Amino acid sequence: MNTVLMTHILAEGSMGMADIANEALLLFVGTGVGVVLNLYIPGSGTAIRSAQREIEEMFISLLSRMASELGTPGENGEQPDGRGFQALEQALGQAVEQGERRAYEGMENSLLADTRYYLAYMGLRKNQFAILCRMRDCFSRMESTPDQALVVADLLQSVSGSFHERNNALGLLDELEHVKLQMKAQPLPVRRQEFESRALLYLGLLELEQFLVLKKEFALGLSRDEIRRFWGRG
């Protein structure tokens, strides 16, 4: 656009008020057409929503797998080696990174697309993925499986079963608080190995709490318009 205007000015040799007004009008029309065309460029919303579904399905699988491993220890009480889990974990990490890139691309390619929500969503899942890895690390380091592991496994299944974009996690946080109170009320183990394993289990539970708190904060940070548009709630 600037090149066109400069060409006109050089061709004219001199510029009167009428010429300046004409060039200003040309600039206005050209810019306006560009903006309108940009507004109607198909956004990447469909691709991002597809990425969201893929990411959520992977989270559900990982949480369910973690619950199963925690609730069904090996013959000597040790946790499984988790090789299958690691493959799922790697796939989820890649999906989250790809989803975040798509959200940024949507922001760059369209003026009207409300990518603030998508960027916040992908940021949420990225942080939750990091927590999930730390949680898994806590459980895998347990040399024996405490009795309380079954309760935590049930909670993980609850999280997996209700894992969804529109879940604000408030009910799950209440359930988690109940599990924490149960664990605190039980006597401490005598043997060192049992003590360390229960401590790791509790650390994993605290990571799960942070996992849910992030979702609660994400939900509370949404505007009414975002809830209506992206969650379908008025």
What are these regions (language model features)?
Residues M1-V35:
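Pore- and pathway-forming membrane helices of multi-pass small-molecule/ion transporters and channels
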Residues A24, L37-Y40, S50-I55:
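Extended alpha-helical interaction modules
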Residues V33-G45:
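Membrane-water interface at the C-terminal end of transmembrane alpha helices
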Residues A47-Y118, G123, R134-G234:
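Long, hydrophobic alpha-helical segments that serve as membrane-spanning/inserting helices
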Residues I131:
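Heme-based O2/NO sensor domains and their adjacent alpha-helical segments
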